[in-house]
Design a protein with these regions (language model features):
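Post-DEXD/H (motif II) to motif III coupling segment of the RecA-like Helicase ATP-binding lobe
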Residues: 1-70, 77-86
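Conserved segment of the helicase C-terminal RecA-like domain
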Residues: 21-36, 178-181, 185-218
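Short glycine-/polar-rich loops that comprise or flank the Walker A/P-loop
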Residues: 21-25, 44-47, 120-122, 162-165, ...
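Loop/turn-to-beta-strand initiation segments
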Residues: 21-29, 96-97, 145-148
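Conserved strand-helix element at the start of the C-terminal RecA-like helicase core
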Residues: 26, 81, 87-115
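A short beta-strand-to-loop transition that corresponds to the Sensor-1 phosphate-sensing loop
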Residues: 29-33, 52-54, 102-105, 151-154, ...
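Conserved helicase motor
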Residues: 103-106, 124-136, 150-157
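A short beta-strand element within the Helicase C-terminal
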Residues: 159-172, 182, 198-201
Length: 226
């Protein structure tokens, strides 16, 4: 079973447990384990099998923390912070697709408007849970018909975009949990054509979740022999 929907949901654990036959096997598949599953491993109630290396044989891309000050204040003044503007300009010289992850739809709307103003040569769209044509936009981004995609955590997992770079805006926001940050990081370096990429956690300061996410990614690389 896919372990992701099980987070903090004892009802699902109970339902699946009841569904397994007497001699049946129950296998949870996940890129980011839950506290409940980790506890079961420590108690030796279940066994953990890890596949830390990607199919192309390269290490996971490790996020880099970047200080980004006064984002909200600048946005309210209808300005993109100078550092963020510079980072995006540098990234666009590569022509690789770029995803900007944001915590909230409202913030995403504002950033979308400002980026369209400042990057008139780019095709920029926003994807959220309320986007009716989300699948269409995702496919266009995959086909490079869209060059910059602003997204909430709706695209943190379950999608693959070749050669993509990722910036997480306000990575220290409470909605960016360790699990979410690890999953978002996993969008980078997924293709054989480009098993690397630029992966930035931008925030005014840091958070426990940011530090834990980076630690977990480094541990997976060590486990894979890097």
């Amino acid at each position: 079973v896919d372990a992701f929907p099980f987070v903090d949901n004892p009802v699902l654990y109970h339902a699946v447990s009841n569904a397994v036959t007497k001699n049946g096997k129950l296998i949870y598949l996940t890129a980011t384990s839950t506290e409940e599953l980790d506890k079961k491993v420590k108690k030796q109630e279940i066994k953990r099998v890890s596949l830390p290396r990607r199919f192309h044989g390269n290490p996971l891309v490790v996020p880099k923390k970047v200080w980004l000050k006064d984002l909200r204040k600048k946005i309210e003044k209808k300005q993109v912070p100078t550092k963020l503007l510079k980072l995006i300009k540098e990234q666009r010289k590569t022509s690789f697709p770029l995803i900007l992850f944001v915590s909230e739809i409202e913030l995403g709307d504002k950033i979308l408007s400002l980026l369209r103003r400042d990057f008139k040569n780019e095709i920029i769209e926003l994807v959220t849970s309320k986007t009716d044509n989300r699948l269409e936009l995702v496919e266009k981004f995959r086909n490079q018909e869209i060059t910059i995609l602003v997204s909430t955590t709706i695209l943190e997992r379950g999608v693959t975009f070749p050669k993509v770079d990722v910036f997480v805006i306000e990575a220290n926001h409470r909605l960016f949990t360790k699990s979410a940050l690890v999953q978002i990081a996993g969008r980078v370096g997924r293709s054989m054509e480009r098993p690397t990429g630029k992966l930035l956690y931008l925030a005014e300061g840091s958070s426990k979740e940011m530090t834990q996410a980076i630690k977990e990614i480094k541990e997976m690389n060590r486990e894979a022999g890097f």
